[in-house]
């Protein structure tokens, strides 16, 4: 079936699937999103595990290149250089249609993952969906949930068992739990014997001054690799729906995601380590949902879900 996005030529999914299926040299272009990058690295790893040569272009992957040993990872490919750079590959692939840009003018064959699957829905986890697509549709025999990430050898996994890495920011306000609730959650975690640390980029610290004003500790993130290190050596992770949550799961840390969109978050939730989501008991539709869930989901509910996560994880590792 042929589909087309605005400004792009018709896309015949069956033809483009065959192009990727038979490609020996693949260029994987990553969207400028951390979570999407980590998920699509699963396709990269499954292609590589079945004898394909894959080059990754993406700034988030490049920032974590030491965590992906043996994989050819380069910075994002500027569109002005795409025609020349992609000429050496049998197929160029990316998750989204036309993002970071359309590939039709630059690659001999190309592939948009989103054109072949249900993007958001019930009954699946995105990471599992990518693995299953690689096996069932691309015909790759050796497929797993592994995306090639390996913690740096000098690190100690969950060295600080009572430390909780908390990520209060997100890509949009509608995904961001209320700041006052993050403050109260931190205080409740402290009273429960945990050590919450809030991960913030330098430019976010002013916006989140309420955390330091209430005596809560800040981890000032600068390099993404350092953030991965900090989370990998923490015991737990709590945050909004964001790429940092996927990173936490990917480095082996149990994750709790706070959300007002449970259907979307269930399918897009972190999938490498133990994870749970928590959301209000009642959520209206449309814009009301995006405005109100942030306040309706209370800290006591999130702390209860956090305790359920700790119980679940500790039971799993004891079995």
Q: How does the language model describe each region?
A:
Residues 1-319:
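Catalytic machinery of carbohydrate-active enzymes
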């Amino acid at each position: 079936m042929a589909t087309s996005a605005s400004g792009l030529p018709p896309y015949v999914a069956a033809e483009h699937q065959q192009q990727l299926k038979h490609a020996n040299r693949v260029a994987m272009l990553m969207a400028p999103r951390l979570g999407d990058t980590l998920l699509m690295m699963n396709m990269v790893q499954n292609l590589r595990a079945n004898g394909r040569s894959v080059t990754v272009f993406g700034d988030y992957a490049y920032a974590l290149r030491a965590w992906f040993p043996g994989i050819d990872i380069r910075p994002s490919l500027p569109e002005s250089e795409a025609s020349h750079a992609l000429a050496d590959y049998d197929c160029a692939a990316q998750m989204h249609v036309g993002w970071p840009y359309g590939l039709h003018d630059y690659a001999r064959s190309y592939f948009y993952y989103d054109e072949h699957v249900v993007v958001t829905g019930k009954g699946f986890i995105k990471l599992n969906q990518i693995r299953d697509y690689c096996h069932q549709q691309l015909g790759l025999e050796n497929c797993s949930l592994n995306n090639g990430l390996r913690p740096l050898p000098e690190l100690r996994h969950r060295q600080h068992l009572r430390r909780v890495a908390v990520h209060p920011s997100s890509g949009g306000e509608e995904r961001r739990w209320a700041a006052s609730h993050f403050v109260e959650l931190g205080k409740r975690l402290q009273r429960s014997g945990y050590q919450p640390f809030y991960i913030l980029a330098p430019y976010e610290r002013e916006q989140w001054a309420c955390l330091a004003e209430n005596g809560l500790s800040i981890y000032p993130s600068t390099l993404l690799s350092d953030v991965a290190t900090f989370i990998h050596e923490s015991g737990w992770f709590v945050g909004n729906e964001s790429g940092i949550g996927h990173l936490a799961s990917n480095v082996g840390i149990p994750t709790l995601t706070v959300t007002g969109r449970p259907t979307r978050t269930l399918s897009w939730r972190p999938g490498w380590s133990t994870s749970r989501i928590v959301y209000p008991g009642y959520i209206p539709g449309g814009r009301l949902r995006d405005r109100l869930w942030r306040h309706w989901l209370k800290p006591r509910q999130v702390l209860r879900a956090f305790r359920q996560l700790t119980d679940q994880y500790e039971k799993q590792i004891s079995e």
